[in-house]
UniProtKB/Swiss-Prot annotation:
Native organism: Escherichia coli (strain SMS-3-5 / SECEC)
Keywords associated with the record: Chaperone, Cytoplasm, Ribosome biogenesis, rRNA processing
Major location category of this protein: cytoplasm
Protein name: Ribosome maturation factor RimM
Protein family per UniProt: Belongs to the RimM family.
Comment on protein domains: The PRC barrel domain binds ribosomal protein uS19.
Source lineage: Bacteria, Pseudomonadati, Pseudomonadota, Gammaproteobacteria, Enterobacterales
Cellular component GO terms, alphabetical: cytoplasm; ribosome
Summary of the function given for this chain in its UniProt record: An accessory protein needed during the final step in the assembly of 30S ribosomal subunit, possibly for assembly of the head region. Essential for efficient processing of 16S rRNA. May be needed both before and after RbfA during the maturation of 16S rRNA. It has affinity for free ribosomal 30S subunits but not for 70S ribosomes.
Keyword 4Fe-4S among record annotations: no
PANTHER family the record matches: RIBOSOME MATURATION FACTOR RIMM
Pfam families: PRC_RimM, RimM
C-alpha cells in the first residue's frame, strides 16, 4: 500500500523562517515568531520542517490566527499543551526552492550573512553578522576585524543599491561598498 506522505522528507537547502514560541492554551496552540519581512508571509511557504533530536520532521499547519500582539498556530497532531511544549523554540524551516525567485539586485538577508565587506578603496570593513530593518532601508550590521585601524567594533552600513552598495558577489561572498571606514 502506498503511503500518503509527501516526497520531501527533509529540506535540501534549509532556510529558517521563524521559530515556535511558548504554548498557548490547552489545545496545542503555539505562539510563532516570524522572521519574514511581512510577518504573515511565513504561512505562505509550506511544508514546514523542524528538527527534533537531529532528525528532520515535516509539520502540517492546520490553522493560525492573531491573538493580541502575537500570532498563534495550530499544527496537525499537536492537540494538547504537553505536545505543544515539546515544540517550543523549534526553528521553522523551509526549503529554499519554496521561496520566490528574486529580481536582479535583490537578495535574501540570509545570503548576505557572513559576506566580507570591502570599500571601493580596498579597506576591509569586516563581516556581515546581522541585518536590520529601519523603515526607510535595510542596514548591514558588520562586525569589524579584530585589529581594525579605526578601533571600530561594529559598523552599520545602509543597504542602498548603487549609492552605497556597489557590488554584491555571492560566489566570492563579498560586498563592495562606497563607505568611509571611519564610520
Amino acid at each position: 500500500m502506498m503511503s500518503k506522505q509527501l516526497t520531501a522528507q527533509a529540506p535540501v537547502d534549509p532556510i529558517v523562517l521563524g521559530k515556535m514560541g511558548s504554548s498557548y492554551g490547552i489545545r496545542g496552540w503555539l505562539r510563532v515568531f516570524s522572521s519574514t519581512e511581512d510577518a504573515e508571509s511565513i504561512f505562505d511557504y509550506q511544508p514546514w520542517f523542524i528538527q527534533k533530536a537531529g532528525q528532520w520532521q515535516q509539520v502540517q499547519l492546520e490553522s493560525w490566527k492573531h491573538h493580541n500582539q502575537d500570532m498563534i498556530i495550530k499544527l496537525k497532531g499537536v492537540d494538547d499543551r504537553d505536545a505543544a511544549n515539546l515544540l517550543t523554540n523549534c526553528e521553522i524551516v523551509v526549503d529554499s526552492s519554496q521561496l520566490p525567485q528574486l529580481e536582479e539586485g535583490d537578495y535574501y538577508w540570509k545570503d548576505l550573512m557572513g559576506c566580507q565587506v570591502v570599500t571601493t578603496e580596498g579597506y576591509d570593513l569586516g563581516k556581515v553578522v546581522d541585518m536590520m530593518e529601519t523603515g526607510s532601508n535595510d542596514v548591514l550590521v558588520i562586525k569589524a576585524n579584530l585589529k581594525d585601524a579605526f578601533g571600530i567594533k561594529e559598523r552599520l552600513v545602509p543597504f542602498l543599491d548603487g549609492q552605497v552598495i556597489k557590488k554584491v558577489d555571492l560566489t566570492t561572498r563579498s560586498i563592495e561598498v562606497d563607505w568611509d571606514p571611519g564610520f
